[in-house]
Each structure stands twice: as C-alpha cells, then as structure tokens.
Swiss-Prot record:
It comes from Aster yellows witches'-broom phytoplasma (strain AYWB). Its cofactor is Mn(2+). The active site is at residue 62. This is 2,3-bisphosphoglycerate-independent phosphoglycerate mutase. The keyword Isomerase applies. It catalyses: (2R)-2-phosphoglycerate = (2R)-3-phosphoglycerate. The lineage of its organism: Bacteria, Bacillati, Mycoplasmatota, Mollicutes, Acholeplasmatales.
Length: 512
C-alpha cells in the first residue's frame, strides 16, 4: 500500500429524513454511525432526479447511484434517453425495432414484449410498453403482439400490479402470461426461478388460467401473495414464444433482465454471473431463429440487437486509479456485485490493471427479512484481510442490507439490517484507520428510512431523500453536493488531479 489509502463504503439504501416513525435508520441502534456523524465532517448529497441524470422527481436506484459515484459526473440515464426518444418521435423510427418488425412480417410470426410492468422507472416504465404497442399497431401487428407481464411490488406498491394490468388491457394489449419479478428477474443465480419462467414462455409449462386477469390477481392477493411473488401462469397458450418469433425485452436496466435474456438468446453460454459456470438451459427447449431486441446492452452473453446504446464514459474513477498503476479492490455480495463492478465502471465490463474483485455469495433465502444480516460479516472479514495486506490504494465496498431488507417491507428486519451494517462498518473502518487510511461513507439512494406509505401499508420502494456523506478526515470541511461529486472528492483525498471528463466537484470546501 502507498502512503495514502481511501476506501468508499456504500451503505446501500440508507437515506435521510426528519420523519422518525417507521424509519428503520432512526429506530435502529447505530452507535458507530452516530459517532461518525458527531466526530467527523459530513454533509448530505442528492441521489435522485436530475442530479443523477433521471427525470425530475424520479427516485434514485442502485444502478444509477453507482454509475454516478464511479463516473464523477452526472450520467444521463436510459430512462431519460428513451423518454426523450418518445417525445421527439425518433423512438418510432428506431432501426432495431424496425428490424424486429421486418423479421415478424417475413416469417409471419409473433412479436413478444417482455418486462416489468411498472411506472417505478427503476428497471422499466409503462410508457415504453405503450409506445412500442403504438409502433406495432402502426405496422399492423397488433394482433401478432403478446405481452408477458412481470409484476413488480418492490419499486411500486405491493398490490399495484392489478392496476397496471387493467391499464394495459384497456390500452389494447393481449397479455399472454404473468410472473412476479421474484421469478422472472432474479439476479442471485437462482436459475430454478428463471427456469420456471423460461419453460412457461417457451414450453407452456405453467398453469393456464381461465379466470379473468383481474380475478386471478385478486386471488393471489387474498392468499397473501404480493406482486413480487406471483407464480408464473399463462392466460393465452397461443401467445407464447415459438421458432421465428421476435422478442423485445422492455427493461432498460440490465442487472435483473440479463439472465432470462441469456436463457432465451444464448442458453448454453458460460456466464461470469453463474457460479456453476453454465446457465443450465442447454437441456431445455431451444427457440430457433429468435430475433431479440434489448432496450440497452445487457451483457456480452446476451445475443441481441440493442435499441439504445449508451454513451461511453471515459476516465471514470477506476480507470484513473488503474492508469496511475495503483491497486484497487471491489467487494460486495451477489446482490450488489454488478454495482461495484459493471455499474461503478460506467456500465462496462472492464478488465482494469491491478484491480481485484471479491464476490461474497448472498444467502440462499426466499426473502432477506429471513436473514437481515445477509453476508455483511463475510464481506467485513474479507475487507479487513485485504486492507491489512496493504496491497491496495483504494477500496469500493457495498453493504446491501438496508436496501435489500428494506425492499421486503418488514420494519423489524430492516432495523436489524441497519444495525448489522453499523457494527460491520466499525470493523472495516478500524482496519482502515490501523493502516493510516481514510474512508468516505455514502449511500446510493434512500429506502430503509421509509418503511410504510401514507396509508400505513408497507413501503418497499426507494425514496427521493438525501443521503449521508461522511469523510473520516478531521482536517477538511465539506459542502453539500450530489453523488457525482464523490469520485472527485476521493481523488482529492488521494491528491490526484481529477480528469477533465469528471464534471463533478470535490466536496472538500477547504482544509481546516
């Protein structure tokens, strides 16, 4: 390790609010965070809306947060880009969408829209489904179009799926199948869940429901099953995916969509995100001559055409460190591993020089309220070993607990999650202090500080609240800012000049 070390500790989903009721952050016993806030320079950061490249008033999320944290500039998001394309009508002349239409017409086949039906704006948006349906109607394909609806219940209300389904039916959609995001959009290598949805879409291996969609959804609710956990079912057996069909995956955020997209487009791929090495879809029914469009680039294993390419970000934090010959470490558990790697690196799969990664498996539980400590202790132990090795100049670490447990809507479990992170944070920072290093502590967005909505129902979504930022250097004074200012601040602490591409500013107002 060189004479300077700076670690970035991301407390995922830990926002700030004056509202104390149903606030897991306030109700938790956090003696170490209390100590840090009392004894070290701290400020607040904006982590939502236009300050992170989202539409005004749009809640932040982990992808957006880590992009801005690592890029050191406001990164305009896919949601903003696609919304603009709809407004200026370029959406309706998009080359990739038109290729899918041509494929369907040439093969006299079907076109399928897959994705999270939600206006949460985190992974997808209802307006994008409607714009695509408008385009398909213009091309006389309304009767060939089938929607496979993945219900949300995390970034939106737990029982809001029924209203989104009504909305889409009223718009004219033919909904062929439904599945909760727990099954369709898993990102923790639970391939058995993805397999259920894959087989439903391609092999009709799921219950066929004859009741109305509204009654079917209400039956789930009556059984205590919320939108996230709706088990896959078919409403139109003739609307499933066959050879020569086209699929448009409407999710613009890749981390939860990439596994099902890989299964559909490249089922025998070897995947970095699959610990077993294979997707295990080789033995399933394969769909031949499938034309797949993804809204954005998911990953290299997904064989698709991409409707909206992202602007390449140059001289992000990780690249600056690598180009100087310095050593860096990224560490997280499975749920947030893409965030400290892919997203923190500007939405790219980078192989940076002298950059190591540690992936700690997330616990195999149905929901994280059953194990609110998740893998925080294992992350802590691995981080301490790495820090004491004195190999690294900088560390990027994510504690997922406040966000992932917050998404369950269970207040007591989320309080335990926050308390776990508090104790683990103390151990990590004590290790950093022992090697004469400094730490920046930040959250990427809010969540755990609001566990019930205004009607008293569980609140499982993110918030637009400010987030804390702490620097363990008593010789500085901080000013408020946004997430894009964190990377310049870290470079400032390392006494490295920020590159011109970083338009964020150091939050260090002056030395004391």
């Amino acid at each position: 390790m060189t004479k300077k070390f700076v670690g970035l500790i991301i407390l995922d989903g830990l926002g700030l609010t004056d509202q104390k009721e149903n606030n897991a952050f306030h109700l938790a016993k956090t003696p170490y965070l209390d100590y840090l806030l009392k004894n070290f320079p701290n400020t607040t950061l904006k982590a939502s809306g236009e300050e992170v490249g989202l539409p005004q008033g749009q809640m932040g999320n982990s992808e957006v947060g880590h992009l801005n944290l690592g890029a050191g500039r406001v990164v305009y998001q896919s949601l903003t880009q696609i919304n603009k394309a709809i407004r200026d009508k370029t959406f309706f002349t998009n080359k990739q969408f038109l290729q899918a239409i041509e494929h369907v017409k040439k093969n006299n086949s079907k076109i399928h829209l897959l994705g999270l039906i939600s206006d949460g704006g985190i992974h997808s948006h209802l307006d994008h489904f409607k714009a695509l349906f408008d385009l398909l109607k213009e091309n006389n394909l309304a009767n060939n179009t089938f929607l496979h609806a993945f219900t949300d219940g995390r970034d939106t209300g737990t029982h809001s799926g029924i209203n989104y389904i009504k909305n889409l039916l009223d718009y004219g959609f033919n909904i062929a199948s439904v599945a909760g995001r727990y099954y369709a959009l898993d990102r923790d290598n639970n391939w058995d869940r993805i397999n259920l949805v894959y087989n439903m879409l391609t092999s009709k291996q799921a219950p066929v429901i004859t009741l109305s969609l509204e009654k079917t959804m209400q039956n789930f609710y009556n059984q205590g099953i919320t939108d996230e956990f709706i088990t896959p079912f078919i409403t139109d057996p003739n609307g499933l995916i066959d050879d020569n069909d086209a699929v448009i995956f409407v999710n613009f955020r890749p981390d939860r969509a990439m596994r099902l997209a890989t299964a559909l487009s490249n089922p025998c791929a070897t995947n970095a995100f699959c610990s077993e090495g294979k997707t295990n879809f080789c033995g399933n029914k394969l769909v031949n001559n499938l034309f797949l469009v993804t809204m954005t680039q998911y990953n290299v294993q997904v064989k698709s055409v991409v409707a909206f390419e992202k602007k390449t970000l140059k001289n992000i934090y990780g690249e600056v460190i690598a180009n100087l010959g310095m050593h860096q470490l990224r560490i997280s558990e499975t749920e947030k591993y893409p965030h400290v790697t892919f997203f923190f690196d500007g939405g790219k799969e980078l192989q940076l020089k002298n950059a190591d990664r540690i992936l700690i498996p997330s616990p195999k539980v149905k929901t994280y309220d059953l194990k609110p400590e998740m893998s925080a202790l294992e992350i802590t132990n691995a981080a301490k070993t790495a820090i004491f090795s004195r190999k690294y100049d900088t560390l990027i670490l994510n504690f997922a607990n406040p966000d992932m447990v917050g998404h369950t809507g269970f207040l007591d479990a989320t309080i335990k999650a926050v308390q776990t992170v508090d104790s683990c944070l103390k151990e990590v920072l004590n290790a950093i202090f022992a090697v004469k290093g400094k730490a920046c502590i930040v959250a990427d967005h809010g969540n755990a500080e609001k566990m019930k909505d205004n009607q008293g129902n569980p609140h499982t979504a993110h918030t637009t609240n400010l987030v804390p930022f702490i620097v363990t250097d008593k010789n500085v004074v901080l000013k408020p800012g946004s997430l894009c200012d964190v990377a310049p601040t870290m470079l400032d602490l390392l006494e490295i000049k920020k590159p011109q591409e970083m338009t964020g500013n150091s939050l260090i107002k002056k030395l004391v």
